[in-house]
A protein has these predicted regions:
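Structured-RNA-binding interfaces characteristic of tRNA pseudouridine synthases
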Residues: 1-198
Length: 198
């Protein structure tokens, strides 16, 4: 399974007015069962689902139990290791803020690798760990590489301060492994900056 989305957004330009419920009822009937339009609304001219966004929230789900959950295995990364959550949280704190994230992308020809991460929250219960990322935007594979890096910190195979060394070096080989796509969810796209930074 690839990356999932609970809060994917899209925009279309209509010639004329769509009747109420057109997208949430009529279009939903034509979509496959794993895709659903939950809400639709009108926006001002010039709105673009991707270009008008001011931020995004991603969640990465990890299953640390010895055996993978048969129901959730397509939506979590099975990683049966004992993790130091406090160390992961300390490393996450070093990654927040505005930085050059060249070490945390697999795309070499990015025009700019500067991004702002407002928060990385690491937590969980039992065998389930969630890592939540909130920022202005993310580079190609960035969230998955950040996740792999934090998991290495949690295992004790990577020092906490190494996450900063990777940032400064701008060298992909200094960062952690690429975590699999199946644990990653686009949780929400933000269009009003104040509402999600407070």
């Amino acid at each position: 399974a690839g990356v999932h989305a609970r809060g994917q957004t899209a925009s279309v330009v209509l010639h004329g007015k769509a009747e109420d419920g057109f997208f949430t009822e009529k279009v939903n009937k034509l979509l496959p069962p794993d895709i659903r339009i939950r809400e639709a609304g009108l926006e001002k001219n010039g709105f673009h689902a991707r270009k008008s966004a001011v931020g995004k929230r991603y969640v990465y789900q990890i299953d640390t139990d010895e055996k993978p959950d048969v129901f959730d295995r397509r939506y979590t990364y099975h990683f049966p290791k004992k993790l130091d959550i406090a160390a992961m949280q300390q490393a996450a704190e070093l990654l927040t803020g505005t930085h050059e994230f060249a070490a945390y992308t697999d795309k070499k020809d990015e025009t700019s690798t500067k991004r702002t991460i407002y928060a990385i929250m690491v937590g969980g219960q039992g065998g389930r760990i969630n890592i939540q990322y909130e920022g202005t935007g993310f580079l190609y594979h960035m969230v998955r590489i950040l996740t792999g890096t934090l998991l290495e910190v949690g295992m004790g195979t990577r020092r906490i301060e190494s996450v900063t060394i990777a940032l400064e070096a701008k060298d992909r080989t200094k960062a952690g492994f690429l975590a699999p796509a199946r644990g990653l969810f686009l949780d929400e796209v933000y269009y009003k900056e104040k509402s999600w930074r407070e």
